[in-house]
Swiss-Prot record:
The protein's assembly and partners: Forms a cylinder of 14 subunits composed of two heptameric rings stacked back-to-back. Interacts with the co-chaperonin GroES.
Organism of provenance: Prochlorococcus marinus (strain NATL1A)
SUPFAM superfamilies for this protein: GroEL apical domain-like (SSF52029), GroEL equatorial domain-like (SSF48592), GroEL-intermediate domain like (SSF54849)
Gene from which this protein is expressed: groEL1
Comp. bias (Gly residues): 530-541
Localisation: Cytoplasm
Reaction catalysis annotation: ATP + H2O + a folded polypeptide = ADP + phosphate + an unfolded polypeptide
Entry protein name: Chaperonin GroEL 1
Gene Ontology molecular function, alphabetical: ATP binding; ATP-dependent protein folding chaperone; isomerase activity; unfolded protein binding
UniProt KW keywords: ATP-binding, Chaperone, Cytoplasm, Isomerase, Nucleotide-binding
Region described as Disordered: spans on this chain: 520-541
Amino acid sequence: MAKLLSFSDESRGALEKGVNNLANALKVTIGPKGRNVVIEKKFGAPDIVNDGVTIAKEIDLEDPFENIGAKLIEQVASKTKEKAGDGTTTATVLAQFMVQEGLRNTAAGASPIELRRGMEKAVAQIVDDLKKKSKSVSGDAIKQVATVSAGGDEEIGSMIADAIDKVSFDGVITVEESKSLATELDITEGMAFDRGYSSPYFVTDEDRLICEFENPSILITDKKISSIADLIPVLETVQKNGTPLIILAEEVEGEALATLVVNKNRGVLQVAAVRAPSFGERRKAALGDIAVLTGGTLISEDKAMSLEKVQISDLGQARRVTITKDSTTIVANDNQNTELSNRIASIKRELDETDSEYDQEKLNERIAKLAGGVAVIKVGAPTETELKNRKLRIEDALNATRAAIEEGIVAGGGTTLLELSEGLGDLAKKLEGDQKTGVEIIKRALTAPTKQIAINAGFNGDVVVSDIKRLGKGFNAQTGEYVDLLEAGILDASKVIRLALQDAVSIASLLITTEVVIADKPEPPSAPGAEGGDPMGGMGGMGGMGGMGGMGGMGGMGMPGMM
């Protein structure tokens, strides 16, 4: 394919136009009074969204050079979303300002390389200062971060905080579309897997068709059990103690299963058999997880361990086990042991090392089950358009909350960046020439998010920034008041701010040091009738297939024969 080339100021000018086109579409969404963007779809109703990445991915510009600029800014939004889950519009606003100021200075003769060095030094200092300013998050602060990220929706904030409280930070929290109008939180407590009882005769509650035991012992093995002789020692032990026994094995069958059922129905034993979850190596990993969770030992063929020699100390313990026809849920005791923490850390290391999405999904599931459960936020809304928009907001809020727990919180509304910008004055004094100019570009860029939040709320951005500096308080765009944002619960996750700033300067520094842009030459328009012309003319072209042997026979079934 032929290529188009653009050089120097012309190339940078085209890139800047693309940057501005995309950034201007995104920045109207920032802040509590950010506006929506309507996106036409080829099929179905238009989407009404408030999510930066979703908007960015929909934009393709006609000019190929401008489109490259737009796609570079889309990359900023996507990278920030991928790593932090939120802050995409903040990153875009920062990048746009840095690009505009950087290109203005290079056009005036500044060295783009020295500008970049100055900008990178400034961002490095801001990141260090941000870490010092961050505060750990807990309690109500979790709800406040989620509420702010959800556009001020307190219902969503409370729901996310409740979900994290119930399943812990390591637990899995997913967002799904609901079939009802209401948005609800559904929590599965404990470790659940999709294997039920081996026989319906193990049922303890005839009305609900479940088998449920309080404080049972659990025998965990990857063996197939056919002979009751293998189980007699452990059965005698639990019978003396009077505790229920769950046998979790690859399979319990034949004589062993029949004997267990008979003794259960006679009231001699409180017992149930369950097939082990998953298959192959994943089964061994799952059984190992259950052993760690319950404080038991996995009786494994790989370790040459024998069922006849099982001791009471080898059995796992749980607070409650509920078994249905298709699933089993183990609610562990509250005591969190070191072995469990180490197991979770080990799985997290595996997660970092794998690139397979399937493996990542399964590893995350294992972490969640060990950590205490799974929470599902089921999103409801009157229309499909509102449902999609609400789902995106909840996902952003959930991601921002996780980021806040990881690296702490700071005052929101762009105020923290504004405060940190004041510390760049000393750095600028230590530098000279274009590096100093680069620092000053970052210092001014850090005011851009606050200005845009104010503009979207109907205020003058420059006046708001000036008032914040004068009063020493943050700006609540929802009410138009100047308050202590930490006390008011208007918070941002430090991780989100850090990544937004780092991703913005990364792309901006690349853009201002660009000298040549290469783009694909657009395809010439199709000749009339070749595409999109008379539909029957197009059918005529198919007539050429008549010469293809057997296909020619199908020609007899053509339009003339049907007349």
